[in-house]
Amino acid sequence: MASLLPFVQTRSNTVNFFMRRSGPELWKTLTSVSKSGQKKGRRNTRQPVRPLNRFYRIGSSPMKIEFAGLNAPIRMRETENQNLMSIAEQTEDEIRDSMGGTKKILEERDTGKKKRNREKLHPMERGFSGTQLVGQKLGAPPPLDGVNFDDFETYCLEVKRTSNMTNVFGRVHTMSALVVTGNGRGLAGYAVGKAPIHRTTTAIINGMGMASRKLFHVELHEGRTIYQDFYAECRNTRVFAQRRPRGFGLTCHPRLIKICEAIGIKDIYVKVEGSTKNYLALTHAFVTGLLNQETHQQLAERKGLHVVEMSPSRHFLPQIVASPISTELKTEETLEALDRLNLDDFYGEGRYPLRKPKSLPFFSNLEGHLDARWRKHPFRNQESTMIRLIADNMVPRWTRDARAAWADQRNERMTTGVEPMPLGIGLSHVVPKKDD
């Protein structure tokens, strides 16, 4: 007997690409890198495998909804009465645990990693860039042959990666660190420490040890600045150093500031021309200029003349700073033209730093501006003349006390009737209005 139910032919294709391959194989299609790609650095650009099953499972939710055939079994005997979707009963603790399951997994993952506790530095103790060691104070070098360097301070000027091509190992990379150390009283040293790749700390420690073995002494004028302006160069780096008065400070390259602090220089101006990124050449040029300078006594002995200072604080009266002792003093007849140079022109090899003139504003040649300058021309020297008269005590200073005394005297003359009292605001007299 034939069945009265209609026959409907359906196709259930549950075999596809995702069913044929396992999870690791599917992840490999996204994370794998070829051998040539690994050599070109593509390994670091690939994303890691994500454990998706730990955070989300198909058909699961905090409400524990049961789908027959998905996350719950199908009861063949009760298919007619069984609901395709039902909510399982849960206690409050189970609901709370299911709601915070993902958060708990993330917290466990974060606590499993070791966090690097970096010491928070004061802004004045930070280096050139963020939390890097370059530019920070590194303390004293290690003792050498029983000699302690407790009063020394070390600075790291540069850390970089260098490479060398060898015929056995190929291209070998190393870490290079430029380190300078000094006691702040003229004794300092610098060196380049090297170590294997990714051993930055080892390279700095090696540089500190080498710098402590290569110390040099720099003569400081008044313990704060250089004796004379000098010019020095190394490769494509040119340095113009100029002495400055007390309290001027350090106005120079950031690397040169650390070198000056290590040596003990407090007041100086240094102009760097050419390459400012080659820190080793910059250091070598500056130190060479410091070592080649001579003191005032050495200059007096070499030239056979008095070294004289003329300061505006003494009204430019000459004061002898150094005199020759072992050399015969020259007379006016034996002086040459080269001996009559100023101290600023005596050194520097005839080189001067480039000083670009200040560019004129766009309105400098306009008609209105020229007309305004011409109207101010008769009063061009009044301010400087007033300052000179006050400085020479030709005119008394118009201070607050002097203005108050003048006001009191005029008030007294007006109250006694010696001077007429002014009528109105800024008017000499008031003219009455005529009657019509």
Curated annotation (Swiss-Prot):
It is found in: Mitochondrion. GO terms for cellular component: mitochondrial small ribosomal subunit. Residues 152-218 form the S5 DRBM domain. Residues 417-436 are annotated as: Disordered. The keyword Mitochondrion applies. Keywords: Mitochondrion, Ribonucleoprotein, Ribosomal protein. This is Small ribosomal subunit protein uS5m. It comes from Caenorhabditis elegans.
